[in-house]
């Protein structure tokens, strides 16, 4: 969302672009004492409080994903997670653990020379690739 514009997402996409730029600016301002990097997470459905039942149903309807309102909330969330996963190169849902792993890596000594970068944890969301 920070690099690829789309209709109906002006404020959201602008905020993402601003956050990415802030990471780069802070990396410059705080170096060499502090390394600043950012994570660009994809949609995490499982375990997210952002997806109560009504929002899940709204998203399933928006994306024309077949469902039955009698299905339990977790089954509906799984359908939505699989839809998002299907748009990625890895075809697997992104989890909170995936995000945590990337955050841990960024704070570890393994990436001690990395600064001013945005790490995407999105399963290879090719729609977000820079053109």
Indicate residue ranges for each PLM-predicted region.
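Short C-terminal tail/terminal secondary-structure segment
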Residues: 103-104, 114-131
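Short-chain dehydrogenase/reductase
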Residues: 23-24, 100-103, 107
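Active-site loop of short-chain dehydrogenase/reductase
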Residues: 7, 32-36, 117
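Generic structural signal for alpha-helix termini and adjacent loop/cap motifs
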Residues: 108-112
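Conserved SDR Rossmann-fold cofactor-binding beta-strand/turn motif
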Residues: 36-45, 107, 120-122
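Catalytic loop of short-chain dehydrogenase/reductase
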Residues: 1-18, 23-31, 41-51
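A glycine/serine/threonine-rich, flexible loop-to-helix segment
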Residues: 44-87, 130-131
